[in-house]
Each structure stands twice: as structure tokens, then as C-alpha cells.
């Protein structure tokens, strides 16, 4: 059917209201305000900046550990300490080695684990606060709207079409059907987070990939409330070892928050060999370690969530400018994979994008030639300084932790070069080995007090979708799922998804993939880790998804 869409025009359209997108909007609004106050021409307006947020509230889809380096926030909001919801400054940084029964604190905390001067934060709270500043600056911020489709103009982009609302699960209009808007803009900023669906399309269409494919990890997090005295606010610990195999890359975190709350989780690189490895089970198992068990004893689970993150670093960063478009934040691989710090880099990338757009608006030139200044600004900023030092870091661990420590140690004393520069990488899903008829493991149930099954955790994520809408997890060939994938890999989607979205259900004598899309926490692991790369995550109806309040 042909859909008539309302068309709106903006100077700047930002897709995604995370730290990168909101920093871009706020910094650009401030630049415009100073420009207009000076009497310079042309006169510009912050009201012509549009920001789309697919969540039902600003911050609802924001999840991180999180420890934040405040450098970018201090640039953006110099008096941030007066009003920003920063939970607590870091007071103690520990690096712990776990064996199954014991733990050992490294006497001198390695520099990557030293967080002096940083803050433990709730990213959701911080982003919600930033959203208020953006709206106060006159920017138009639209909640419950996702970018469903790019509007192309030659090799560039000219805006996006938002998702249609009110379609039933068969794609037929319901009584409340509302077509998506056609939003056209002089510059469109993709700030969708890791594995953004529009960014993925643009990178593929315009061949914007770098020399390495992007590498990804999945972070699984729980927020707990524990009895008083169990942990000091500002205590942060990172764990290495059990239960993560030395052949894999990953580790845990424990962060002390105010009001007897604890942020804890496990991060695993999505490039392991066993297709039936289960990151959620690994996290639940990690919690049974005596150190963690003792911390959580007498406490209760408050919130749960999961998110993918870009590990690839400098050599996996896509070209981040095209005619009429820029890529910022996690969509553009702005993450220090050694320190697992990305909030300040995302914010800085958004600010540099704002400065580039501001100059383009003044010149009324939105070509790639003009927007290329964004990349040049990055190269002359502390983003390049930080990421260049760790440009080969994650690739060092492709053959396991011991090999990784050897290479990363050499990189530490050679400014990031090491023995091989650039060190190449392979896409994570290519690491899977075949199952060769091995039986499936028993499914994890949890004890309901310390450890939990997926559905219990999903309940604590606040996830909500209208079940009568088209499935937003598009599998291009279901026959592969019921045949080749069963035999070759044992359907890894049942294991890598932290939200029980995918299951193989029996229908007579055959297996068929069942997709429980309403459980989806928007981590996009399926889009990343599927061995055949036939799953496409697209935006569901706006307002759906998790509610990461306080996370």
C-alpha cells in the first residue's frame, strides 16, 4: 500500500538521545545562541534541531556500568557538579583475580583499572538530566519515535522516516494506525548506539568500513540493594578469571553506589568458539563466587539489563561522514576497549559533530567535503590521543588472555604499536566451531534468590512491547534456523540472547524458531552474533523496550 506521510523539515536531525546525541544537540544550541547574540548572519535557530528518542522516556534505554570520566561533561556544562546526578566519586579502585573458590587483589592497581577522578553514575539518570538541558535550550526532542528508514540523496542522506505506529503483527493497519513522519534535514546525525540499524545500512551501502570489522561485546548488568555496610559508595572492582575461560575475553565489575546499591555485571566479547556458550548463565555463575555471594547476601535484585558495546577501536571505526550525515558515539566506535570507557568519548564526539555542523550551517554547505572537518577535529582531539594508544588492544586477545597480556604489555611501552601494527581482526561470529552432534546443555534455572533465569531477569528490566505489532527481529531465512543451524551450531540464538527472545519449539517432528519479540531488551546481540548474519534488528513501535530507570 502507498502511505501518505507528513513531511517535516529541520536544519539538523539527531537520531538517538544518548550521551552523544544529546551532547551534540546541547553544544550546537549553545553555539547558535552565542552566534545570534553577536548579531552575526545568518541567524540560526535551536528550534530547527530535532532529536528522536525511541524509548518512552529520555534515558529509558540507557545502560552502562558506569564509571564516567568527567572531562567532556566539564566542557559541555562547566558547572555540572551543581546539578548533575553523579552518584559518587570513585574512592577505591581494585583489580581482582578470581579462581572458583577464592579471590586475590592485585597489590598495585594496573593503570587501566585506576579510576581516580572519575564518577560512578547511572547513565540513565545522567541522560535524563541532559535531556532537560537540551529541551531548555529550545531543541525539539521527540520521545517514542525511532528512525526506521534513511532518506538517501545520492551517496549521502537527507533525513529519516520514523516507524509506522498502529500496525498489527501481520503488518495490517489497526484503528489507531499513524504513518511514520518523513523528516528531512540538512544534516542527519546518527547517534543510535552500538550496531545502530540505520548506521548499519549506511555503512554497508556506502562501504564506510575500516580495515577491521567491528568487534563487539555484551554487558549483562544487575542493580542490587544490599544491607548497610556491605560496600562503600565509590568502591569499584574489576574481576578477571573464573568463570570466564582463558581462551575468552571478558571480566566482571562491582561498583558501590549511594543508598546501599551495587552495580554489578559481566562483559564478554562476542567472539567465542563454543556456539552454546551462554553469557547470561556465565554472569549468574559469576555471582556464586564467594566474594560476590557474600556481598549480595541479604540483598535483593532491583533492576536488570543487557547491552552490546563496540570493542573494535581505531581500526574498526567506520568513516563517520557522508554528504548530509555524521556518525557519533557508540555507532561510530568511540570506546576505549582497554579501559571500557566510552561515555566521555561519546559526548566529545557529539560536541565535535556540533562544531562541524555549526560551521556548515553558517556556510550553507552540507557536503562530505565540508563535513569531513568532523574527522579532522577528531584527529586533533583527545579522542584520537586516547584511542590511538589502544588501537591494537582488543585484537591482541583474539587467541586468548595469555596471548593478549603479552601483546598488550608490549603495546603499553610502544605507544600502542606492539609487534604488529595494524593488528588485524575477524568478525566475531566467524569464531564459532561446529557442535558435531554434541548434546545440548541443561537450561539454567537459578535459585530465585542469588541467581535467576532469563525471564525473571527480563521482568526486572521493565521491558514492554505491544505484542500485536510486526516482529522487529527480521530473520531472512527461517529454513536455515530449522536445518543447517540445528546441525552445525545448535541454534546459538537460544544461548547468546540475554532475554529469552529465541527458542526452538517442536511442531510435530520438526523444530521451528519461535521469536518472543516482546522480551527484547534492545541489546542487538542477535544482529551481531548470528553465525549466518541473517537476523536484522529494526526499530519496533516507538515507546517499546526496556525501562532502565536508575541503571
Residue ranges and their predicted role:
Residues 42-46, 333-339, 351, 355-401, ...:
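Active-site-proximal substrate-binding core of FAD-dependent oxidoreductases
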Residues 120, 331-344:
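Glycine-rich phosphate/pyrophosphate-binding beta-alpha loops
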Residues 358-452, 464:
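C-terminal helical "tail/cap" subdomain of flavin- and related membrane-associated enzymes
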Residues 10-50:
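N-terminal Rossmann-like FAD-binding beta1-loop-alpha1 element of flavoenzymes
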Residues 487-514, 525-547:
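Iron-sulfur cluster-binding cysteine motifs and their immediate structural context
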Residues 307-337, 457-470, 481-496, 503:
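FAD-binding beta-loop-beta segment adjacent to the flavin cofactor pocket
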Residues 27, 31, 45-100:
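N-terminal FAD cofactor-binding segment of flavoenzymes
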Residues 43-45, 133-294, 333, 352, ...:
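Predominantly flavin-linked oxidoreductase catalytic cores and closely associated redox partners
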Amino acid at each position: 500500500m502507498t502511505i501518505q506521510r507528513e513531511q517535516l523539515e529541520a536544519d539538523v536531525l539527531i537520531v538517538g538521545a544518548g550521551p552523544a546525541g544529546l551532547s551534540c544537540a546541547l553544544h550546537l544550541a549553545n553555539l547558535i545562541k552565542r552566534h545570534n547574540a553577536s548579531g552575526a548572519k545568518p541567524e540560526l535557530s535551536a528550534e530547527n534541531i530535532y532529536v528522536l528518542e525511541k524509548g518512552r522516556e529520555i534515558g529509558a534505554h540507557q545502560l552502562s556500568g558506569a564509571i564516567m570520566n568527567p572531562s567532556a561533561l566539564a566542557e559541555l556544562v562547566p558547572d555540572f557538579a551543581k546539578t548533575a546526578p553523579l552518584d559518587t566519586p570513585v574512592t577505591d579502585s581494585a583489580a581482582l583475580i578470581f579462581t572458583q573458590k577464592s579471590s586475590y587483589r592485585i597489590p598495585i592497581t594496573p593503570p587501566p583499572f585506576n579510576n581516580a577522578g572519575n564518577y560512578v553514575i547511572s547513565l540513565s539518570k545522567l541522560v535524563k538530566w541532559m535531556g532537560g538541558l537540551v529541551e531548555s535550550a529550545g531543541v525539539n526532542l521527540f520521545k517514542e519515535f525511532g528512525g526506521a528508514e534513511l532518506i538517501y540523496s545520492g551517496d549521502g542522506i537527507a533525513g529519516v522516516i520514523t516507524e509506522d505506529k498502529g500496525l498489527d503483527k501481520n503488518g495490517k493497519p489497526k484503528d489507531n494506525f499513524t504513518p511514520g513522519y518523513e523528516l528531512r534535514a540538512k544534516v542527519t546525525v546518527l547517534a543510535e548506539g552500538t550496531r545502530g540499524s540505520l548506521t548499519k545500512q549506511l555503512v554497508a551501502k556506502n562501504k564506510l568500513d575500516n580495515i577491521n570489522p567491528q568487534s563487539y561485546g555484551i554487558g549483562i548488568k544487575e542493580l542490587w540493594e544490599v544491607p548497610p555496610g556491605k560496600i562503600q559508595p565509590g568502591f569499584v572492582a574489576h574481576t578477571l578469571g573464573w568463570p570466564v575461560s582463558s581462551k575468552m575475553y571478558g571480566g566482571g565489575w562491582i561498583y558501590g553506589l549511594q543508598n546501599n546499591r551495587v552495580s554489578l555485571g559481566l562483559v564478554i566479547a562476542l567472539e567465542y568458539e563454543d556456539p552454546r556458550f551462554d553469557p547470561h548463565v556465565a554472569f549468574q555463575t559469576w555471582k556464586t563466587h564467594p566474594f560476590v555471594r557474600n556481598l549480595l547476601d541479604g540483598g535483593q535484585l532491583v533492576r536488570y539489563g543487557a547491552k552490546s558495546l563496540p570493542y573494535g577501536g581505531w581500526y574498526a571505526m567506520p568513516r563517520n561522514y557522508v554528504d548530509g550525515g555524521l556518525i557519533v558515539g557508540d555507532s561510530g566506535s568511540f570506546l576505549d576497549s582497554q579501559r571500557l570507557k566510552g561515555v566521555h568519548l561519546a559526548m566529545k564526539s557529539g560536541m565535535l559533530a556540533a562544531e562541524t555542523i555549526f560551521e556548515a550551517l553558517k556556510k550553507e554547505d552540507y557536503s562530505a567535503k565540508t563535513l569531513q572537518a568532523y574527522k579532522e577535529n577528531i584527529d586533533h582531539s583527545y579522542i584520537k590521543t586516547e584511542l590511538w594508544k589502544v588501537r591494537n588492544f582488543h585484537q591482541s586477545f583474539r587467541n586468548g588472555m595469555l596471548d593478549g597480556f603479552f601483546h598488550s604489555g608490549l603495546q603499553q611501552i610502544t605507544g600502542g604499536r606492539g609487534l604488529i601494527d595494524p593488528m588485524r581482526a575477524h568478525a566475531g561470529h566467524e569464531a564459532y566451531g561446529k557442535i558435531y552432534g554434541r548434546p545440548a546443555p541443561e537450561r539454567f534455572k537459578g535459585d530465585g534468590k542469588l541467581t535467576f533465569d532469563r525471564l525473571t531477569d527480563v521482568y526486572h528490566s521493565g521491558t514492554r512491547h505491544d505484542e500485536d505489532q510486526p516482529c522487529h527481529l527480521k530473520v531472512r531465512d527461517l529454513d536455515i534456523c530449522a536445518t543447517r543451524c540445528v546441525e552445525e551450531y545448535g541454534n546459538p540464538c537460544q544461548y547468546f540472547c540475554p532475554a529469552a527472545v529465541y527458542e526452538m519449539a517442536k511442531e510435530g517432528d520438526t523444530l521451528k524458531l519461535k521469536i518472543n519479540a516482546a522480551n527484547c531488551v534492545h541489546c542487538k546481540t542477535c544482529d551481531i552474533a548470528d553465525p549466518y548474519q541473517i537476523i536484522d534488528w529494526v526499530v519496533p513501535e516507538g515507546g517499546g523496550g526496556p525501562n532502565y530507570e536508575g541503571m
